[in-house]
Amino acid sequence: MKETGNRLPWWKWLLLLVAGFLAFTLILGFSQLPVAVDEEHPIPAWIYINLALLSSGAVLGLYTVWRRIDGYRRAPDLAMRKLNADLWAGFGIGAVFFALLTGCIALLGGYRIGSVQWDTVSLVKSLFQFLIVGVGEEVLFRGIVFRMLDERWGTLAALVLSSLLFGFIHITNDNATVWSSIAITIEAGLLLGAAYKWSGTLWLPIGIHWSWNFFQGPVFGFAVSGNETCSLIAPVVEGPLWVTGGDFGAEASVPAVILGLAVTILFFYTPSRTAGTSR
């Protein structure tokens, strides 16, 4: 291992952080090409799946190369031996999270099932669309931003700053408000950062992020960070904004913030697999 974290001169560390953020922001944009093409000219599902897998694989491959550039001989947070266990554990956490959140909103009178509409092709495409999103955003915000801040300034600073950046980058989304960005900062930014720190891999937050979006939109029928999707359930969402999140989606609800904060605290009070590192 070469110079990393607080061993680097500050200017070199800052250059790597800014360059990494800009480079992977562009890479994240390019990784969305299959989604953009499909919106204009629908692609057969099997082609879409392969394009999504290739796109996600390319992002992970480029991240591995970047880890060599910023001082590592390999990317320990992409350890293949942990892929299956952490990715699918994360997927389960995201699914349970949104099932519980939807139940809470329903109990508060803000959600009920209007109808159910099964569309296999739409569900499959949505599943792989949100895989691309989960991989790209976790590599950018946890693999680049959180990790480099953590190595330099420690976990608390990394968690706060990366979460704020993650939350407020969504301010440009449809129907976004300052509150929706604060909500994402707390419920998702903190949770995903805690999952990354606890597990020591990107696979766990990728799995959470992937299923979080998939169950939020294509399954339960909420807007995903302000963006409407085709969904299995066509819900009737009504009630005060603090209960439902309004047009931005359930992420902007108070129950989501409370539940996300609870899961974050649970991660930090559960013995960490990276107990030898700063927390």
Question: Which residues are covered by each model-predicted region?
Answer:
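Aromatic-anchored segments of alpha-helical transmembrane domains
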Residues: F21-I27, F98-C104, S163-T172, S211-V219
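Juxtamembrane helix-loop-helix connectors linking adjacent transmembrane helices
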Residues: F30-I49, D70-V139, F146-E151
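Functionally important transmembrane alpha-helices
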Residues: G29, S181-L241
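Membrane-interface helix/loop boundary segments of multi-pass membrane proteins
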Residues: G136-L161, A194-T201
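Membrane-embedded alpha-helical segments of multi-pass membrane proteins
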Residues: L53-A58, L123-F128, G136, A183-E187, ...
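Small-polar-interrupted transmembrane alpha-helices in polytopic inner-membrane proteins
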Residues: A95, A99-L101, F130, G134, ...
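N-terminal, membrane-interfacial amphipathic/helix-forming hydrophobic leader that caps
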Residues: M1-R74, G217-R279
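Hydrophobic alpha-helical transmembrane segments
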Residues: L14-V18, I49-N50, L87-G92, L123-V124, ...
